[in-house]
Amino acid sequence: MFHQIYSIHVMIDGTMTPVVYALLPGESQFVSTRFFTLLKEHMSRLNLSFTPTRAFADFEVAVHNAIRQVIPGIIIKGCFFHFTQCVWKKAQTTGLQIFYRDNEEVRTLIRRAAVLPPIPLDRMEDVWFQALEDLEDADIPHNTQPFTDYITEQWVEGDRLVWNHFGTEGTRTTNNIEAWHGKLKRKAQHSHPNIFTIIQTFKEIQNSNDINRIQREAGGTIRPRAKKYLNILPSSCHPERKIPEQSNRFDDLADSASQLLHLG
């Protein structure tokens, strides 16, 4: 009857909090559009506004199209972490991961691709094409073209506004939501729980969130984010702290930031 659990989370007092829980029968654009339409209608009946200006979502075209159809003008951003996963998965399918650990030039190529999101849009092509030029003199015992073609065609020539995070304020990943789904699975204690177990789990999680919210409002402490996540995107992501826009500086920035990524 149901194919997936879908949740919507919002930032409340600096904490990403689930506010909508849904059981969907599929992953198609029709299903996603129907879900967001019903949600919008339900909120209207409750006299609540449903006019978000920005949404974070996985890189799923069906979901993006559905959100844009129901909420015209919304800005959709993809998860930076999922972007790096897409890059690493392509490195695996094209055979480059075999050389990643021992070949510095392969490692640099993959990392430069993975760290494109924090580079300014008007400099991003320069950084990537510089990486391609560097390949001409590289000693790589494997064909890199399937990988570089994928990065160029899928991302550099694709919808850059979705995955580029230069200037993005606040969170740039959905890692906290992934952690929430992990918590949900542990609480359900079954790989295929029945609907009653799922609903009960939703209630328990919501009760826990309500308690945490009350504690925060009463002045309780909030567990700080891990420092590595705070620092993973450097100052280039914030317009007020731009570095001088020379191409070689952004090459250096890409290489430096890539050291914070955990690939392989």
Across the structure, where does each feature detected by a protein language model lie?
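Electropositive, glycine- and tryptophan-enriched low-complexity nucleic-acid-binding patches
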Residues: 1-48
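Extended amphipathic alpha-helical interaction segments
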Residues: 41-242, 262-264
